[in-house]
Amino acid sequence: FEKADEVVAAYDAGRCDTYTTDKSGLAAQRIKLSKPNDHIVLPETISKEPLGPVVRQGDAVWEDIVRWSLNVMIEAEEYGITSANADSMKSSDNPAVKRLVGAEGELGAAFGLDNDWSLRIIKQVGNYGESYKRNIADTGILPDRGPNQLWTKGGILYVPPAR
């Protein structure tokens, strides 16, 4: 098969007994089946393939902005910053929180952005947990975050220091 949709169609028609890919792919393809509830995504992990944002080669500035936009969402979750409370975090006693929401330092300047760029991400998209819940868990695709949890909750998500 050349395309994922061809594999899914063959599986749905009974021409394949099983179908394997990463869990997020399986979950997303499952909803396309004629009877999605008749099929399950097994909990076992056969291999680990981390997925993340990608950009075209040769644009290091855009790559940094995309990567750090995701990092902002992850770090916001770690610090308990949500789309609902982001503005109030400007007056936090925690200097790292103040840096993250642009109340101190010049994190945005490193990327050619203003200091409110990270605050706007959090307010408009939410932290990583909010975004995961809204776009993945609540849709039934992958209700359990598994490794998509913060490292403090047994997952693999953490943000390298930014100074």
Model regions: which residues?
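A short acidic, often aromatic-flanked loop/helix-cap motif at beta-alpha or helix-coil junctions
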Residues: D5-V8, K48
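C-terminal capping/gating helix-and-loop segments adjacent to ligand/active sites or protein-protein/ligand interfaces
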Residues: N115-P143
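A ligand-binding cleft/hinge motif common to bilobed small-molecule-binding domains
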Residues: D5, D12-A13, D17-I40
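Secretory-pathway glycan-assembly enzymes, especially type II membrane glycosyltransferases
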Residues: T139, P147, W151-T152
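Extracytoplasmic low-complexity repetitive segments enriched in small/polar residues
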Residues: A10, G14-C16, E77, I121
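Extended ligand-binding regions for polar small-molecule ligands
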Residues: G25-L26, P43-D116, N127-G129, L150-T152, ...
